[in-house]
Regions:
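Active-site and donor-binding regions of nucleotide-sugar-utilizing enzymes
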Residues: 2-129
C-alpha cells in the first residue's frame, strides 16, 4: 500500500472507520456486502450488482476493495446508490469494527482470497458467505 502510493486514501475505512454519510446510507437497511480485490473482480462485481438490484430492491449493496485502482474503477461503474468502501485490513479489531457498522446479512467474496479474520468474523456472526 505504501510503496504504490495512495495509502492515505480511505485510510480510516481500512481501519473499519466509516463516514457519517456512509453510516446513514446503510442505517435501518439490510446489507449485502460484496468484496472485490482486483479491477477484474470489480468488473465482475458490477455484473453481480446488475443481477441483484432488480431482484432485491430493498437491499443496500456495499462493495469493498483494498486497492486504490479497484476503488477508482468502482467509482466509474456501479450505480451511485451502491456503497463503495475500502476493505478493512484483516486485523481482528478492524474487521470487528467493520462488521459492527455494516451488519451485513450476507457477504459475496468475488474470488476465494484468504482473509482469516474476515472469514472468522462471518462465521461467528452466522453471516452467509
Amino acid at each position: 500500500m505504501r510503496r504504490r502510493g495512495g495509502w492515505r486514501k480511505g485510510f480510516g475505512e481500512r481501519l473499519g472507520r466509516y463516514s457519517t454519510k456512509f453510516k446513514q446510507a446503510i442505517s435501518n437497511r439490510d446489507v449485502i456486502w460484496l468484496h472485490a480485490v482486483s479491477v477484474g473482480e470489480v468488473n465482475l462485481c458490477v455484473q453481480i450488482i446488475k443481477a441483484l438490484q432488480p431482484r432485491l430492491p430493498n437491499i443496500k449493496l456495499v462493495v469493498s476493495t483494498p486497492t486504490t485502482t479497484g476503488m477508482s474503477e468502482l467509482h466509474k461503474k456501479p450505480p451511485a446508490e451502491v456503497g463503495k468502501i475500502y476493505y478493512p485490513m484483516d486485523r481482528r479489531g478492524y474487521v470487528r469494527r467493520a462488521f459492527a457498522t455494516i451488519r451485513p446479512k450476507a457477504v459475496v467474496l468475488v474470488e476465494a482470497e484468504i482473509w482469516p479474520n474476515f472469514l472468522w468474523g462471518l462465521q461467528s456472526r452466522d453471516i452467509p458467505h
